[in-house]
Structures are given as structure tokens and as C-alpha cells.
Amino acid sequence: MYGLIFTTFMIVIIFIGPLTYSEPFALVNSTLILSNPTFDSINPQFSVLNNSIYAAWISNLSPQNSDVMFKKIDNNAKLFTSILDISNTPGISNIIKLTNSKDNVYITWEDKQPDKWKLLFTKSENNGNKFDNVTNLSNTTGNVHLHDLSSVGENVFIMWAANENVSSTNKDIFFRKTQDGGDSFNDTLNLSNDKDDSLDPHMAINQNGSIVYMTWTECDTKHDDPICSISFTRSLDGGNTFTTSKIVSNKMLSLEGYEGYSLSNGTGVNASSNTIFPHISENVTVQEGINSINPTVFTTLEGKRVYVLWEQSIFGKGESEIFLTVSNDYGYSFNSTINISNTSGTSRLAHGQLLGDDIYVTWSDTLNNNKTFDVMLRKIDAKNLAGNVINLSNNSGNSVSPYLLVSNNKIYVAWIDDTNNSSVLLWIGDTSESPVMTKVMSNGQAEVYSNPLIFDTENKVWIAWTQYDDNNNHKIVLLDQEKL
């Protein structure tokens, strides 16, 4: 009932970099259906330890009941465990986060119980073979609305947005940590604690867990259509204390040392149009305010450099851009804000990853008010110099939900494309300065796909997605690709 199912799938592979081929070929691999096809399964999460892959997702067992499922797979997809029902409650389980440290696997999720939405936690101390009892992390707060999870060794950090109590209306950001792998947790900290709504929390930690950076969306509740900003806080003592949160969005500075950039089709853009200068925002009205949402935060291994990425709509026009701000002093100050997308269209769904001090960002963009989205890629280096914007998809269909992986000096971007039929597309590029070449290797199409993810093991790159089948169920699919 809970075994893996193998099917044949053809995926579009696009290589950009020094690789060339004389004739196109089709890459046909066996896909692994992780979930039980009897149930509708969504929201997959993955974590890797050496050559072991940990997978968790939500399966809808009935209209009134969904649970958190877990499976472990080896790198060759030959050894795998049965599906474990982690939550096993009569209500609704949703929004999973999954991470691991050495032999420990940590899972959090939001669970709708009779009194409220709760944030629950469980752990495995034997590589996911067995999980401990469930802990309620949000027992002192109200309804939970999204959360994030990080870990280093036995240090586990959890942040979430929730009402302060069951009767309160505004939402704050809360934080708890454990230093013993989840056996016990510190008291809950309220990191926002104001009258605004604090939503969509995200965090990043340095390599030893001594530095914790957090960001979230802060929305003004005074207006029917609230104006939102991006808030930031930090802890330099492993999550024991945090600085007072501050707004890092809507602070427009010039891009130092950069004279311009060009789109992949060679269209030049003057550097002055790549920045919104401070004086423009001085006369902004409530109806034309700058609205900032969907933040993410990144940090380097030692934690000195911090990057905050977000989506921002400008002056009530409906268009949106992708912005990045950078700190070089452990989050004490943010001295540059870069409009990464800088088009007259709509820029959405940004995803980024660090390679050393450089950050790569991909997103979907309608460019100059086209009706369809393309997938874009841009690099910002350690000196805050912005590279060319590359249109990865550049077709007549919609290309959405891009996801990025940078590994072994290769760049992998997967997305969903509907040019012909719904397909998962994979782009592979090189981080070197070699000439850029593009060649379409194959075309592939199948059922309806959504939410691609990419991760890697020691010698493979794995692509996962959610696939809608003929039985009106979603299933979790996994495909491997040997590293180049």
C-alpha cells in the first residue's frame, strides 16, 4: 500500500554553459511516486544527510482529516522505508517544515485542533526510523499562521506567526529553541510585540547556530488595504536574546559601482532606472504606498553577510518588483537596496541561494507587461554588483514557480511551463565566466504539475514536484539526475 511506484517521465533539459551537443536527445528516467496514490498528497519537504533523503508531505485521508507523512529513501532509490504517519490526528495537519542534523530528524507542522491551530514538533534520533511523542510548541499563543524551522546539531530553532492569545486579533512573531535536540524547549519569546500584523516568518542561521537572523512581513492594520513592510531582527548569542526589530524595506539607495545591465535579448537599461531614490518616496500617500511582502533571508557560513530578499509593489500600480538588501556587518546596518528585476511588468515568486558571498536569484516575470510569465535569473556578487538578467524560459507560455539550486559550480533551475501542456523544465548553467550557450535538449509533457523543488546528494541532483493525476489526486514525484 505504501510502496514506491515507478513511472516513465520525460523532462526538458536546457544546458547553458560550456556544454554542447550535436543532436538533441531525450532524457528518460524512472520517477519515484513517494506518496500513496489512494490519497491526495501535497506540500512536500525534503532534507538530505549524506546519501539519505528524508521526505515529508501532507496526505488528505478524508475531507475532514489530513496527516503528515514521512519516508526515507537512499541515494540509489533502491532502499526506502514504509510511509510513516507522523501526526496521526483526527483533524487537519498542514504546512510542514523538515530538517536534520547528524542522526536527528526534526519535523514541525500546523495542526487544526478543536480550540485552535497549533504548532507541533516531533523528532527522530535514529535517522527517521522512529519518531518521538509530539510536542505542542505554541501552547502559550493563539492560532498559528505559518512558521519556519532551522537546526544545527541538537540546537533547533522555531519561529512562527500567531495571535498573542485565542481572543486577540493582531498577529505577532514568536520564537522557541531547544539545545538538547527537542527534549526540552526554552520559554516563548515575542519578537514583534506591536499593534501591527506580523506574518510570513523566515530565518537563517550561521554554520554553528551562534547567529540567528529573522525576517517577516509587518502590515499596518489601520487601513482596509494594509501597507506592508519587511521587518528584521537578529540574535548574536544563539537565540537567547534578540535586537529590537527594524524595517529593512522601502529604503532605496543607489547601486554603487554599477553602470547598468542588459536583458538576455540585449536590451540595455540605464543604471538610474535600476534604483528608486529616497526623495521619490517622501510624498507617497496611503493609496500609493510601497507594499513589501514574501521575504526570505540568507547568511554566509560565518554569519557576517546577511541578505534579505522580498517582493514589492510600487505606488499602488499593481506591478511588483524583486528587491534585495545586504548587510556586511552581522545585520547591524543595511547599506544597499537593489531592484533585481526592474521591469515594467509583474515580478513574482523569487527564490535565491548563496554561493560563498554571491547570491543567485530566480523569479517569474511578465517583463514589459506581457500576458505570460518568463523565468529570470540574476547574480549579485560580493561587491553588490549585479550581473546580467537571463531569461531562462523565453517562450510563449507561462513559466512559473522557479526553484534554484547551486552546487559544484553548477546552477540548476526548475519550473512549471504550460507552453504546450503542463511540464517540468530544468535549466542547467555554469557559474564560471565561460561563454553562454543555450540548446534545447528535449521536449516533454505529461499531466498537470506544480511546485517543483531541487536538492542534491553526493553525486545526484533530485527534482521533486506535485503531480495531479487522472483520479483527481495529487501525488508527490521524485526524479534523479546524475551531476554533471
Predicted regions and their residues:
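Extracellular, repeat-based ectodomains that mediate carbohydrate processing or recognition
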Residues: 21-484
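Secretory targeting signatures
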Residues: 1-24, 55, 70
